[in-house]
Amino acid sequence: METPKYKNALIVGAGEGLSASLARLFAREGIRVALAARSVEKLGALCAETKATAYACNATEPEEVERLFGMVEREIGTPDVVVYNASARARGPFLELVPADVAQAIAVSAFGGFLVAQQGAKRMLPLKHGAILFTGASASVKGYPQSAPFAMGKFALRGLAQSMARELSPQGIHVAHFVIDGGIRSRTRAEPADRPDSMLDPDAIALSYWNVLQQPRSAWSWELELRPWVEKF
């Protein structure tokens, strides 16, 4: 039973919260980290802390995603862990939704995931080694009122992950989708003082991602649900 070894991680849709927790955990484990976001200015402190390299990239643009992987490959090494964290929302009553906003939400949440995963898989398959992780949400499995675009994007991302897992797992690529069913606490989003542990801790989520990465291929998960102990489901 062999535990997988990873060298280079690329986190797309990076920012504070879960992405930062993942970057810190990967760095502690000796993995080189690349962070990608539309705006990299916000990533300066995290890069300094983790020795990560930041890249500006619009994940919905095929040329930019291809260029991103080329730069990461040259400057850090071929990513053998790719995490897709990007998502977008367009809220409002169904009849008031703006088509362009809906299209953008789906593009960021789902189409970007396809573009990033395709570039990652293209590099992993010749090596028969690698992992592609997708961050989902409650909306991956449940549609909520006035949140149709987010559900559309997250449902699509989950379908992408499931299809990829069935196709690529037999070729040595571990594909996993994480349903984050609850709010993630952050510097700007604290949990109620009278309800401890009622929100997801990003460090705890990152540890769950890491545990999935460490699974031997004889017992791979393709999906994991994470929620606080008080969350109803």
Question: How does the language model describe each region?
Answer:
Residues 131-156, 161-162, 166-169, 184:
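Catalytic loop of short-chain dehydrogenase/reductase
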Residues 6-7, 78-79, 93, 124-137, ...:
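Active-site loop of short-chain dehydrogenase/reductase
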Residues 117-118, 162:
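A short, exposed helix-loop element centered on a Lys and neighboring polar residues
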Residues 56-67, 99:
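The beta1-alpha1 cofactor-binding region of Rossmann-like NAD(H)/NADP(H)-dependent oxidoreductases
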Residues 170-185, 191-233:
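C-terminal helical subdomain
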Residues 93-94, 101-103:
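Substrate-binding pocket helix/loop in short-chain dehydrogenase/reductase
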Residues 15-16:
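Conserved glycine-rich cofactor-binding loop
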